[in-house]
Amino acid sequence: ADGSINFTPTNDALLTNPLAEIVPGTQVDNTKKYRIFNSIYTEVKLMEGLKYRVNFGPDFTISRNGRFYGALTNNIKGGNPTATTDNRFGFNYTIENILTYNKQFKDHNLGVTLLQSMQRDNFEQYTQSVLGVPVETQQFYNVGNASSIQGVGSNLIQWTIASYMARINYDYKGKYLLTVTARRDGSSRFGENSKWGNFPGVALGWNVHQENF
């Protein structure tokens, strides 16, 4: 015995040695993923009580998965080595435009917020599977020199969400509060006749602890 693993320890070729798969390079499943994201904003005071702010949030992702099964593995059982690559690219971003106005008139406080936002997502995927990798040390790299292509696939997913919102906050002496909100949201993933929805709202408040009794 030279210490090497006997791939078929019996006369039955279908009964392979599971320990063969611990040999480095015979079976590979490798994933690399990189992601860059951030949140950027700028704010400008247009006049007394009036401000404009823009928020931008980009999110970029790239990943690669490679799989390789050599001849001496339980999946292949002495046949032709196989390899698969899966490459994915994603770019998502959110942008918000916000206008706010706050003003006090003696005992009255008024706040107005206007918002427009959009979220966009773009996802791409490319896959390829081959049979008959000529040199096992190349694993899932250079799959173009394999003896045959088993499958090629691609995928593209894109969607957009858009929103508009207006909100008014009012209070009198901090005692009596009123908030009125109107929002309109739309999504490209909904049907042609149901892409948009309207969401109004009204809230009343009373700060009892501000009363004199």
What label would you give each PLM region?
Residues 96-100, 201-211:
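Short, well-ordered amphipathic alpha-helices
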Residues 51-53, 109-113, 177-179, 201, ...:
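Residue-level detector of the transmembrane beta-barrel scaffold of outer-membrane proteins
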Residues 193, 199-201:
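Outer-membrane beta-barrel domain signature, especially the mid-to-C-terminal portions
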Residues 1-22, 67-82, 124-152:
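Surface-exposed loop/turn segments flanking beta-strands in extracellular/periplasmic regions
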Residues 62-67, 108, 121-127, 189-193, ...:
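Outer-membrane beta-barrel proteins
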Residues 20-59, 63-67, 84-104, 123-125, ...:
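Outer-membrane beta-barrel transmembrane strands
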Residues 184-188:
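Conserved short loop/turn motifs at secondary-structure junctions
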Residues 48, 106-108, 174, 200, ...:
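Short coil turns and loop connectors of transmembrane beta-barrels in diderm outer membranes
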